[in-house]
Amino acid sequence: MEKEKWWFNSMLFNRELEYRCGLSKSTDGIGPIGNTNGSEDPVIDKNIHCWGDSDSSSCNNVDRLFGVRGIRNFISDDTFLVRDSNGDNYSIYFDIENHIFEIDNDRYELESSFSSYLNSSYLNTGSKSNNHYYDRYMYDTKYSWNNHINSCIDNYLDSEIRINSYFSSGGDNYSKSYIYSYICSESVNSIANASSDIKTSANESDSHESDSHMRGKYNDLDINKKYRHLWVQCENCYGLNYKKFFRSKFNICEQCGYHLKMSSSDRIELSIDPGTWDPMDDDMVSVDPIEFHSEEEPYKDRIDSYQKKTGLTEAVQTGIGQLNGIPIAIGVMDFQFMGGSMGSVVGEKITRLIEYATNRSLPVIIVCASGGARMQEGSLSLMQMAKISSASYNYQSNKKLLYVSILTSPTTGGVTASFGMLGDIIIAEPNAYIAFAGKRVIEQTLNKIVPDGSQAAEYLFHKGLFDPIVPRNLLKGVLSELFQLHGFFPVNSNSIK
């Protein structure tokens, strides 16, 4: 029985046609037809990238149009359809062997070929009922060929490049394939297998192994470094996010919704009303209280390097500001600074923040992102757990004020064992890694396997470890409602956004 196949540009699963990705450089500058000399105006709506052994760069907007049997009888293997920024569609004939590159906006030949294909298909089968394209379009005057072609293009311009495909390896079941596109460049010549860039859910038992293999493939690509200034790669689905808009989307992956790590400065900028942020104790820096000895790098030098790298003085930023007009005291930990580890300065800054909020009767927010106590400061770092907890007790129990703890990924160690879990309301981000001891430490200490996902926010939520799980883009609104519910209102009602 003949099986229907969906052809991606007549060649995705056909290794003998991989050379057609060479179209890339010739079409990079396609604008309104007539401009084939590489215009600076990026006129292609979006990119469809290459998977193959070719050394060429990306193929621009080569759209998948039809899924009919015998498609090769309908259109040449070297003919593609593209769309420019004006929404006009053109057929492109490309022959890499004979160095032929032709662009045509006259669809007469294309329509004729398609009509001939339908007629021949009808004659061969002897029944038009076997060809739904024939039935729908050959005799129904409501449809014009132009509308049909445009409709086909629109149906396949999927921003996620998610297409139902039939695996060329055989089988009767259709599967959803997710084609992970990346920018192909001249440097990408190590990818030898086109199917290695396709993640499929067809075989769930091999998903973990394929994910690890895919992660290795992506991490080995030089392109990740070359285009790091343009794209941010998701840790979960390995998809690419445009860096220019990534922060405005709260560092949430557009492909899968995964929450990537976020700097303390970005959190403050996106959470606190503009012009209201007033930092506290930002000149407080760490010293080497126990003269920690390290064969690799002295503690002071390591602090200096992180200060230069992050632009911060320590692993937490504290201050006061307004959230939708409501005055608050907030501390935001930054995992980029020595893993957000809690040393004496971190503990002192958070303690002073809570004491200030106690005196001013302000609600407190602490955003946790930490690997735990800082080992370079020994017992002094452990003392910060008790010091912060003591200040929090006076704030919450004696003054009856509101403390909201926000757990982000990761929140572990001494932070989890102290102020991270002391909030009147404890909020977690989706998929946040929350634990006291990490998975590796537990497995090495107890010689037991820690199940995957047992330290994720969703699992711990069902165990009652915290209150709600709130997506990052909704957090500001949720906090505003919580504060008003507990009697903290905007200083100016007009400032509510």
UniProtKB/Swiss-Prot annotation:
Zn(2+) binds at C234, C237, C253, C256. Gene3D superfamilies: 2-enoyl-CoA Hydratase, Chain A, domain 1 (3.90.226.10). Binds 1 zinc ion per subunit. Keywords: ATP-binding, Chloroplast, Fatty acid biosynthesis, Fatty acid metabolism, Lipid biosynthesis, Lipid metabolism, Metal-binding, Nucleotide-binding, Plastid, Transferase, Zinc, Zinc-finger. A zinc finger (C4-type) spans 234-256. It is an enzyme of class 2 (transferase). Pathway: Lipid metabolism; malonyl-CoA biosynthesis; malonyl-CoA from acetyl-CoA: step 1/1. One of its GO terms (cellular component) is acetyl-CoA carboxylase complex. It is found in: Plastid, Chloroplast stroma. Acetyl-CoA carboxylase is a heterohexamer composed of biotin carboxyl carrier protein, biotin carboxylase and 2 subunits each of ACCase subunit alpha and ACCase plastid-coded subunit beta (accD). Belongs to the AccD/PCCB family. PANTHER family: ACETYL-COENZYME A CARBOXYLASE CARBOXYL TRANSFERASE SUBUNIT BETA, CHLOROPLASTIC. HAMAP family: AcetylCoA_CT_beta (MF_01395). This is Acetyl-coenzyme A carboxylase carboxyl transferase subunit beta, chloroplastic. It comes from Nandina domestica (Heavenly bamboo). The lineage of its organism: Eukaryota, Viridiplantae, Streptophyta, Embryophyta, Tracheophyta.
